[in-house]
């Protein structure tokens, strides 16, 4: 469909559905061109007019000035379309100089550098020649045999010049055909028969048995298949004609000093034209061949420089003086390239920026806009109004009035900005709340005023931050700003669904102060009041204080609507606060009748939102803010040195710890513990000491003084306004342990605190951590920003496309338990999800949830009462929608608190939710000033509630002291309540002492087990005598003498380093009384393999008792964990990288058996399946690595066989996608939870869904796929449905996990991939394969200049589609596609339409009755 332009020439409207890219043929280049360029001249140096026939020729590219030919004969619009007979220039708009292309006819063909050097080399793949050979033909003057005829050469053989000359002497010029340069490559490409090559490769694939050869053949076959499908011709990769960019895209700009600034492209074109012309002249002179070859090589290099300077094989001899010239590729790629700089990131007009200041007098939907700024931003609106009212007859006069700031202008400005929202944005915009709409309020001054409550959403503070203002111009833009982006609509955070418009800092302090209750003297009478006005009078007169205890008669509404009155004990402050609460049955006085900290305030705002809706919440928040500020200033809370109270017990605690540390040193001197054990114990002891001092300090600081006043610093920290216990600990307790930059902990702590002041030595120790924090901040911000960019890129095309995909699948949601403690309850995990199946109460069998029902707060309460421990819910991972997700699989839109609406861009929201805290966290490493944040190691298991014990896999032996020692690697203690429901589950490590038995009842705080957290023991199961096998001094064990103690330990060393150690298998064997190897309970020999680094506790020939520790493996010294370690971990998980030393995962259920020999210095482990008919599965464990299974142990599919992090790809292969999801969610959430950041699981699931989009073909069935090829899951499933219908063999495949970078580059859209990374590579591949971009995602639509297919754009697309349908198809399309989106409105429009023209179903939906298209 073509649209006529104002000027009369046509431009294509945006009515395309997809974009296709392919290699341009010489014919198409000539067809696009308006003329050939043969001259390098640009402008005349005297007249500055453009030269004819040159690079800026007006005859080819169009006139320089609008409607004016070069010689000036025709100079008016009326001559438009005439070609001047004198100068040959067409009279038209000068805009055509941005569109019209020229071309250069090359005398000699030239290879396109992209297809030659972008790996894998496409020309090389088609010709089956290595890239080096092709380069030698193109650049070094080697020859290639085109037709050997009678000679012994083979076709395509590369020969040097000397060999060519000898052959020519021997066989004559006619004896064979061999060529050099691009002509030779072109000739080979022309002669290719791709169909025959494909058939040959397919037959070779069937016959070959070598895996290496198979991979090579598959790679080439895939390239050839793609090329055949694309419809390109091989010889098009060799250029015979080059297109020339329109001149206005490579302009000549004159600088202030009169010198011209020339675009780099013009240099490239000049070089090419010069060399091309020189070659043309040379050929006519018939010079020696070497001169021609040299000139052709130079032409090849010039063209390489134009297309891609970075891939040139030479460096120009003049490079030093000329500098690097940007090529066409450089203009596309990178942050400054065309894609990211101009297409995805445009500058915006009608915008301004200024410093922000606090505006406590504003309402939540308002912001203060300086008058001067508003005047400039709304200038056109003011002009039109002034003109309309007749105040200024012309625009010019209106502008003058605005400049001179006449009084009438201000009145008009007031009118213009009324109800006209503006957008405020603060960089960096890490999530969608970084850009919100406000109603402007005109203010004096030059700074923008911001409402204090939106600061946390913008992450803004008032220490000099700047913000940008944007004016939405069109009515649609204003409508979207008001309805969707207004700050009052952004009460909840999209990442976790909790309120983000929440009081903080001094507001919290004010409310905390207001709700405090002072301790009453025993003889003091409690005053009673019946009305609020009396309380206010008493306060005003100073009879009572806001925190005095009073009795008050409270009227409240029962659930049945009756009013009851009761007397409550409260304070005047709490009554004042109660006044601002909205009336609702769920909001009771108990909410206020307590001391409110930030946690309680947040949950109150949340409850008000859920109960009373958005409007009430906004009003309540504003009132809350005013109260908070008022009482924070009235309270007079200050911060003084004396407020930091140092506990009296500090000296005693430090003395105590020092004594214990001396003890550890003595144990170390006596050789009872190793160096690393001593270090770990010392660090642990100081951690305990610091915690004790901190506890005593908090106790001392939280007490009121003689006047009953609370400590100011305690109030600040306790209320959550500012500061934390760990900061207070450093101020008034003890700074504690510090970390080195490497992450290790320095074992001498800082005993002083900041009030006492640090000694020089202590200060020096503390600088490590503080400086590391600052360096980290700078580095990690970039890392985190890059992670967000990759996440957005991988998830940008994931939107909600339908209401229900009808899947029966889902994932099981459970509470998250870490280290025995519940860190995320089942309530929080299932809230806002949709039930996948009908769920019943296990006791009463009452239906709690029906399939497809949204789980809201009420349903969560039912689940909790029923005591369920797992619920199957719908998940984005199992959604079966095409091109997106359905509403039910996604569940609640967290920012609204209701089911997600169709068209929501959930992918981008997920990416922002995961990426935004990353940036926050990286900036937060130094807030605790580098003190080591590390908990005391867990060394025992204590019951946290009264329960009954159930032991799982508890294989125990009794040692000589009568202790029960756990011998199982998978022992678990489960705590059951009185009904038998599981309340907690703890794993007990191998070698622990167990104090409980199966079925035993335990009381809260009972110790159930304990173990040494710093070593992994190896323990005997039987009594007997130890014998060393393959433990040879100097080869596999060494006496390691500790210089500081003089005691030596026998330590296992790496025996592979010795020649005689190659076949050793160092182990300890247990002999029975007869001197034979003892057999264990599972009929296996009692032999114990020892890993490298193990310390032997027994001598050769020593008697041991069952349960004795014969070897111990020291654990690493524990490093501090913060997000610095956490962010790289998140990146590693999302990039699906294989961990360096990943654990081996068992593929089957079965029994462990150790191999008797080694394979290439690796130890064999066999898993014998339970089903004896199946073969054993073999695994190779690196020698000296500690296996966490014993011989004869039963392992389940997916269990780990050795220490380390498992590989995600293994989890997916062995256990499937659901297990992978649960592993990744728990690992990622662990990192964020450590920083107290809450992210909903569904965001991680959305990203995971995008990572699992591809499958690997294991059997191609009756298709053209190749084994091992990667294909889109949707595509394969669609193909399989067709194959099954046709009765053919379907494709077999396995899911694969791709990292986010790889998934982004592997997307269906080449435009999106090219704008992400590796631009030239992506475009080369796309053009070579003739790819189509269906324009489904957000990025590609932004790039082609359309409305994105999300939100409003999604609906508009659907409506436009409807408008294009035949009338007969309206109702069908509407019922299938639009009813669920448009709801009742659509039904009304259909009905209106039918009423307007009866008998024509759905016609009036557009056109007559309903004006949807006008909208």
From Swiss-Prot:
Binding locations of Mg(2+): 461, 463, 465
CDD domains, alphabetized: RNAP_beta'_C (cd02655), RNAP_beta'_N (cd01609)
Cofactor annotation: Mg(2+); Zn(2+)
GO molecular function, one term: magnesium ion binding
Gene Ontology CC, one term: DNA-directed RNA polymerase complex
Binding site for Zn(2+) 1: 69, 71, 84, 87
Cofactor remark from the record: Binds 1 Mg(2+) ion per subunit.
Binding site for Zn(2+) 2: 805, 879, 886, 889
Catalytic activity: RNA(n) + a ribonucleoside 5'-triphosphate = RNA(n+1) + diphosphate
Keyword Transcription regulation belongs to the record: no
Xref: SUPFAM superfamilies: beta and beta-prime subunits of DNA dependent RNA-polymerase
GO BP annotations listed: DNA-templated transcription
Record Gene3D superfamilies: 1.10.132.30, 1.10.150.390, 1.10.1790.20, 1.10.40.90, 2.40.40.20, 2.40.50.100, RNA polymerase II, clamp domain, RNA polymerase Rpb1, domain 3
Keywords: DNA-directed RNA polymerase, Magnesium, Metal-binding, Nucleotidyltransferase, Transcription, Transferase, Zinc
E.C. number(s) listed in UniProt: 2.7.7.6
Record note on quaternary structure: The RNAP catalytic core consists of 2 alpha, 1 beta, 1 beta' and 1 omega subunit. When a sigma factor is associated with the core the holoenzyme is formed, which can initiate transcription.
Function: DNA-dependent RNA polymerase catalyzes the transcription of DNA into RNA using the four ribonucleoside triphosphates as substrates.
Sequence similarity: Belongs to the RNA polymerase beta' chain family.
Xref: NCBIfam families: rpoC_TIGR (TIGR02386)
PANTHER family, alphabetized: DNA-DIRECTED RNA POLYMERASE (PTHR19376), DNA-DIRECTED RNA POLYMERASE SUBUNIT BETA (PTHR19376:SF54)
Descriptive protein name: DNA-directed RNA polymerase subunit beta'
Organism: Anaplasma marginale (strain Florida)
